[in-house]
């Protein structure tokens, strides 16, 4: 089975967490002889080819990061230029990733994605949701492989089922809400560790001041 994958991430492929997830997913999907083609909307030179692939194929997966509780603007712009299909048979599925540990943070976007295929003349193939992936591109290789391994498994699953069944993706998404006890533990012990971790990341990115610095405070009345 041939699968067209369209990445709706705004970051270039080399810097994109979504691209890393797509790579892991493809590995599992292609194990039994399936084929995939991937188009990255961060590269606008690929838009015409991506639109043509959408038009000519019947098995499509859009992978995207969560942006302000919904889809990235670059993906919305691309979708607005597509012509709805007039011939039935195309299945449109989604892979939604974000940095929040609770699956509930993605439900608003999921609701939008559920109605989107109908507007494009397609049937809905389900949405695979996974959060707590903010540090995916910042971890070491071994930890990154550990985080990506479940996506390879879901690639195998998708190759067999052809869609994301609700029960399977609900288990994959993780906790809908973090337990109160876990939140308290994080506030007590996790935040100091997080500050150290984010401080190291900021230095790698070229920051020379504290993350809580307020350089414009003196100008605010």
Q: Could you describe each region identified by the protein language model?
A:
Residues 91-146:
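Short, glycine-/small-residue-rich phosphate/pyrophosphate-handling segment
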Residues 38-44, 74-77, 93-101, 126-134, ...:
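Low-complexity, flexible helical/coil segments
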Residues 1-88, 163-221:
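N-terminal beta1-alpha1-beta2 submodule of the flavodoxin-like/Rossmannoid cofactor-binding fold
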């Amino acid at each position: 089975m041939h699968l067209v994958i369209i990445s709706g991430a705004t970051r270039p492929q080399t810097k994109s967490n979504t691209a890393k997830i797509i790579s892991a997913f493809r590995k599992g999907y292609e194990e039994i002889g399936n084929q995939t083609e991937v188009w990255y909307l961060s590269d606008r030179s690929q838009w015409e080819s991506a639109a043509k692939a959408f038009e000519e194929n019947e098995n499509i997966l859009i992978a995207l990061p969560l942006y302000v509780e919904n889809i990235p603007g670059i993906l919305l712009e691309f979708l607005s230029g597509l012509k709805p299909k007039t011939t039935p048979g195309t299945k449109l599925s989604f892979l939604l990733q974000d940095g929040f540990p609770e699956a509930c943070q993605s439900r608003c976007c999921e609701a939008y994605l559920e109605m989107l295929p109908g507007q494009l003349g397609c049937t809905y193939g389900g949405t695979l949701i996974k959060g707590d992936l903010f540090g995916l591109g910042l971890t070491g290789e071994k930890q990154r492989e550990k985080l990506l391994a479940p996506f390879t498994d879901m690639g195998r699953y998708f190759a067999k089922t052809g869609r994301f069944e609700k029960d399977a993706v609900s288990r994959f998404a993780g906790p809908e809400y973090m337990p109160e006890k876990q939140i308290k533990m994080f506030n007590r012990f996790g935040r100091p560790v997080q500050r150290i971790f984010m401080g190291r990341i900021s230095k790698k990115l070229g920051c020379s001041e504290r993350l809580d610095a307020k350089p414009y405070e003196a100008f605010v009345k």
